């Protein structure tokens, strides 16, 4: 069974390579420039994307602690971090749109041949993005307008949608490393199973790595901001409290 599975994987990867090679006519004229542009765009987007995944959970946790303990500093931090989250979400939406356009323009051969296989995760990611945007708007607008409990609950879909959005996008990248969910006959794709493509062997490790990295990036960045402030002499509770919260998140991870 193991030998058969390995053989199937090798055949699938060989078929992928052949089809991509056959699509060379629509490949970028300068692959090095195309790769450089894609790498630069992704390098910028991934930083904002990590914050977009990890920061909602941190903001929601701080607000929950504020409601539970009655500490006004928690509420103040949650409100200010939420504003920063709104800006980061807008920047991430723009940078993510650029990456998606580059994927279709620079590597149109891949998408033309395999769009039916890996199109579903991008579609689901789009739905998750809109859900995240809608509830983030409610969350930001709902300060002092919704009850504390309703406002806290309005942030839950933001956290869930952000995690799902990242996981489904990563599954498309994982499929490139472990392609499955289709059969090539006569140079054409038949028997396409998008869910099999999404749930390929590389999706679990890559998605786990991505999500943990997102929370770690968020924790380290938030802790460093207030650590710098404390080094400059601001050692009041407002600066001490947030410097400990990200450390707690990192310790849990």
Where are these regions (language model features)?
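Polytopic transmembrane helical bundles with strong interfacial aromatic enrichment
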Residues: 2-5, 10-253
